[in-house]
């Protein structure tokens, strides 16, 4: 084993993967790989692969290795991690082969899902591997003292999962992980445009709509202007132009937002019950 370690932290996300070196974000790329169908070799990773989605090319297929916050395609995930590490800026590259990785995982991951993350990272070059639950990493990243006795609650809406956790003394006091998040919002928008405007749109277009006019409330003080969306009529394939408002998007996201609200309330309910038990045990002592 090498005497030196190249240390990197990876936020392995459903939508985007972030790599941190020496406390600095050095890569933030879409979690997408493009693979040549003939020999299964890697064509592109991240931003270079993302535009190839939904192109219908026969010789190249695009894969999102993670789904709902967990690895859905082991080989593609390994290729993505290797490809992203190879993309690190020269100042963060070295001749060292030994890599120490810290990787985020959803708090609701099963043992099998965690094993898949470990295997994928080790195949991608990790010699030392540490896993941290995503809400804990989010709290640390926000500068919260997770070791403090005062509790804090984190609600982290990612691409594949929404992570909810109450943290105190470096531990989860209560937590929830639901597979309703950014990708679900995108699918809601795709379904809405199909159903309401008879328009067929891609996932990247839905992502742009979400970012430009996405909202969880029907009334906003600083409301965004309507967004002009261009896409084919699903029946005739002729081009359509539709102005989409934030109120429309808020309406089509209502059910998913309600599921997140319910999950937050469940976590708060468990937190309150746990606090009552803790208080009772303290009184009993």
What are these regions (language model features)?
Residues 1-157, 165-284:
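Nucleotide/phosphate-binding catalytic cleft detector across ATP-hydrolyzing
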């Amino acid at each position: 084993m090498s005497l030196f370690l190249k240390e990197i932290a990876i936020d392995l996300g459903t939508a985007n993967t972030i790599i941190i070196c020496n406390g600095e974000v050095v890569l933030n790329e879409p979690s997408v790989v493009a693979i040549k169908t003939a020999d299964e070799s890697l064509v592109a990773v991240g931003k270079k692969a993302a535009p190839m989605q939904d192109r219908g090319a026969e010789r190249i297929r695009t894969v999102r290795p993670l789904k709902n916050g967990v690895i859905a395609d082991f080989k593609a995930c390994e290729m993505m991690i290797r490809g992203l590490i190879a993309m690190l800026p020269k100042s963060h590259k070295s001749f060292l082969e030994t890599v120490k990785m810290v990787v985020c995982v959803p708090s609701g991951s099963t043992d099998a899902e965690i094993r898949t993350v470990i295997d994928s990272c080790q195949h991608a070059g990790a010699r030392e591997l540490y896993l941290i639950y995503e809400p804990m990493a989010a709290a640390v990243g926000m500068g919260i003292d997770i070791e403090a006795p005062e509790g804090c609650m984190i609600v982290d809406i990612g691409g594949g999962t929404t992570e909810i956790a109450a943290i105190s003394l470096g531990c989860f006091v209560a937590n929830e992980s639901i597979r309703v998040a950014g990708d679900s919002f995108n699918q809601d928008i795709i379904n809405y445009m199909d159903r309401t405007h008879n328009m067929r749109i891609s996932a990247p277009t839905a992502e742009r709509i979400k970012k430009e006019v996405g909202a969880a409330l029907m009334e906003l003080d600083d409301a965004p202007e309507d967004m002009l969306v261009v896409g084919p009529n699903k029946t005739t394939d002729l081009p359509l132009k539709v102005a989409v408002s934030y109120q429309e998007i808020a309406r089509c996201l209502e059910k998913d937002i309600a599921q997140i609200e319910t999950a937050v309330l469940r976590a708060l309910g468990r937190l309150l019950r746990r606090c009552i038990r803790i208080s009772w045990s303290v009184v009993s002592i």
